[in-house]
Regions:
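Fe(II)/2-oxoglutarate oxygenase catalytic core
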Residues: 1-154, 158-199
């Protein structure tokens, strides 16, 4: 599902904090075209663990690619991190609320965050993730990430890895994968599981 050669060729932006992105990281084959339609119909906000929802085989395969050693090796090399003392926490999002997208950095328990968008198209000016230069201004961004099918961004979690998006309400499909320090994994998984019970 994932074209690892494309990922290897992506240029890392280190101007503020290390990240790289691609407009489409998927292989050029028919099974990838239907991923947006195969994505589970999530009608509430927040993050859903894959284990708590029924998934099509194509989405399972995609997650398997994301969590593969090949992907791990690429992330370690490109973002210059050591992931030997980490575990993966993967979640799905299918619906954006107006309150989502506020400027933030990710928690220090995370080493890397990867976001893969799975929307057939995106005809809105809002809802597109912005990699920001500071915590004050959503319009002062390094790069704006498309929310279309196959669009991906991965960044090293730092004290200044500010990101966010202009408020959007509606379907906004993505998979988020984090490499989390092992000592924090149980806390992350429990929080996502408890959250999913109330969706």
């Amino acid at each position: 599902m994932i074209d690892f050669n494309k990922l290897l060729s992506a240029e890392v932006d280190k101007s503020y904090y290390p990240f790289f992105s691609l407009d489409n990281c998927l292989l050029d084959n028919p099974s990838c075209v239907g991923l947006a339609k195969d994505f589970p119909d999530i009608k509430s906000g927040g993050s859903i663990p894959p284990s708590s929802i029924n998934l099509e085989e194509s989405i399972k395969k995609l997650i398997s690619d994301l969590e593969s050693k090949e992907m791990k090796d690429i992330l370690e090399e490109k973002l210059n991190v050591d992931l030997s003392n980490s575990e993966i926490v993967t979640t799905l999002r299918g619906y954006s609320r107006k309150k989502d997208g506020k400027i933030h950095t990710d928690s220090k328990s995370k080493i890397i965050t990867l976001l893969l968008y799975l929307n057939e198209s995106w005809d809105y000016e809002t809802g597109k993730l912005r990699m920001l230069k500071n915590e004050e201004n959503l319009d002062d961004f390094i790069k704006e990430i498309p929310a279309t099918l196959g669009s991906v961004v991965a960044f090293k979690v730092t004290e200044n890895c500010f990101h966010g998006f202009l408020p959007f309400e509606g379907k906004r499909q993505s998979i988020q994968m984090n490499y989390v320090y092992k000592k924090n994994v149980k806390t992350h998984k429990l929080r996502h599981f408890l959250s999913s019970l109330f969706k």
